Every structure is written in structure tokens, then in C-alpha cells.
A protein has these predicted regions:
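Hydrophobic/aromatic-enriched cytosolic interaction surfaces used to assemble or bind macromolecules
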Residues: 1-279
């Protein structure tokens, strides 16, 4: 993407938005071309073990090719435990109390909120305060969202196709997000640690049973970094007739990967859906 020579104060540069994706053990960055929205530079950053994500991000601002180009605007995707509250029941003054009551070990984090108008909910999630400070030191205009939010938005639109119930299973960062929609609301949404495919199958079928879905007519959709996809699909087919894998790569998206290691991971589905949702 030919933006290396753009001045940070130029109108074109000011329209450029940097995406920062932060999970427990991974960092990556993406920038779309403002003149060609589906052309994206993507840089996975090698995280050092033994130091915090905040410390890794400080180093990245010195070493990353994309971060060194300087930006005014940043959209930060945060992977942390998320609590979904119906908009009609949300009281901002109580968000810290209900979040800490639901999730332990988050006392040193800042609690963030994001209204999800399409799902009629408010997402509460958290970010380490040191990490938040590192980000705020580098950008004038920052927006924080939960990492899975663009996937929710994209797959909610997908759920309107046909009349059958659809259970979505998004795999990322050794986690499994399981969710389904009913009209314009979440019917179910939860996250599981899923290092192993056998555990993932158990969680999916457990949720399926709890929701009382129809094994002959309702549908399971798998997407993301799916472990042992062939085995998992076959295992699910023993219990559910309709199991599908969604494509991880959108045909219209042109990705220029910036990385010293050619074998490094591909752009995550959640970042891709950000650009596709805005198309």
C-alpha cells in the first residue's frame, strides 16, 4: 500500500485508521488503504514470552513497520471476558460492579463498554490499565471494541438467510466463541477455552442440547482457526445432520502481509470482517 510517504497531517493520512488486535498472547496490526478499502496491509507482531503484552506493545511501537508510519486514529480489538447486557437493563453506574461480580481476577483492569445496536445489547469487557495507557500515549483518536464484535455483526447478517436456527462457533487464539441469534438479539453467547478439538465438540454439543435445537434441520457453522477440522466435522455429524465450515478468507479482500517469517499466521477472521462489514 503506497502510504509510506504520506505526511501525518495530510487529509489522506488523517483518514487512515490503524487496527490493533490484542489477545492474551498475540499482537497484530492492520491498515486499510483509504482510497481502496479492500486493500489491507497486515502485520503480525512476534510477542516475547516473559514480559507483559503492554511491554510487548511498547517495543512494537519502536520496531513494527506499520506502527512506525504514525497514525491519528486507532481501532483496538481487545480479547477479554465479555458480559452482554440488554440495553433496556443497562445501568452505566453499575458496570464495574456487575463485571467484577461475573469475572474474577480483573481488579487491575479498566472496564469498557460498547453499545451493540444491531444486537440490542451492551458489551462490557476489560483492558489492562498499563496497556490502555500505552495505547493512549500514541493516538489522538481511539476506539476500543471487543475482538469478537465484528464477527457477531457479520454472522448476525448471515443468520437471516433461511428460517432454521444457526449455531455459530468461532475459533481464535485457542478459544471457542459459541453464539446464536433470535431476531435482533443474542439467544446465547459464551466463550470456552478450546485447546483440543475433543473439548470443542463437547462444548458445542452441550450448548446445542441446552438450546433444544433440532438435530435434523437446524445448523452448525464453524469458522476461524478450527483445530482438526475434518475430525471435528465428522464427530459433529454423528449427532447433527447439518454442519458447515465458513470460508476464512473473503475473495474481495487483498491482504499484503508484512512479516519476516513467511509461515506466520494469516489475518484473523475478526479483522477481515471489520473491512467486509464496512464495504
Amino acid at each position: 500500500m503506497p502510504n509510506d510517504q504520506l505526511n501525518t497531517s495530510s487529509p489522506v493520512r488523517q483518514r487512515v485508521r490503524l487496527i490493533i488486535r490484542i489477545s492474551q498472547n498475540a499482537l497484530s496490526f492492520a491498515v486499510g488503504d483509504p482510497t481502496a478499502p479492500l486493500q489491507v496491509d497486515y502485520e503480525p507482531y512476534p510477542v516475547r514470552n516473559g514480559i507483559s503484552i503492554a511491554a510487548n506493545l511498547r517495543e512494537a511501537f519502536k520496531q513494527s513497520e506499520l506502527l512506525n508510519k504514525k497514525y491519528n486514529r486507532a481501532l483496538v480489538l481487545i480479547d477479554s471476558p465479555v458480559l452482554l447486557v440488554p440495553i433496556s437493563e443497562f445501568d452505566e453506574s453499575e458496570k464495574e460492579t456487575i463485571y467484577h461480580h461475573t469475572f474474577s481476577g480483573m481488579e487491575g483492569n479498566a472496564i469498557l463498554q460498547q453499545i451493540l445496536p444491531d444486537q440490542n445489547a451492551v458489551a462490557l469487557f476489560s483492558i489492562n490499565k498499563d496497556l490502555k495507557t500505552v495505547i493512549e500515549d500514541h493516538f489522538d483518536n481511539i476506539r476500543f471494541i471487543h475482538l469478537v464484535q465484528p464477527v457477531w455483526n457479520y454472522l448476525q447478517l448471515h443468520s437471516f438467510n433461511g428460517v432454521r436456527q444457526k449455531l455459530y462457533c468461532y475459533f481464535h487464539d485457542k478459544k471457542l466463541e459459541v453464539f446464536t441469534f433470535e431476531k435482533k438479539r443474542f439467544r446465547f453467547c459464551n466463550s470456552f477455552d478450546a485447546d483440543h478439538s475433543h473439548d470443542a465438540v463437547y462444548y458445542i454439543l452441550y450448548v446445542w442440547k441446552q438450546l433444544g435445537l433440532d438435530v435434523q434441520h437446524d445448523e452448525i457453522y464453524l469458522v476461524g482457526e478450527i483445530p482438526e477440522i475434518e475430525w471435528m466435522t465428522e464427530a459433529l455429524h454423528h449427532y447433527v445432520k447439518k454442519v458447515f465450515k465458513l470460508n476464512n478468507r473473503f475473495s474481495g479482500l487483498q491482504i499484503n502481509k508484512i512479516a519476516s517469517n513467511p509461515l506466520t499466521v494469516n489475518m484473523p477472521f475478526d479483522i477481515q470482517t471489520l473491512y467486509i462489514n464496512e464495504k
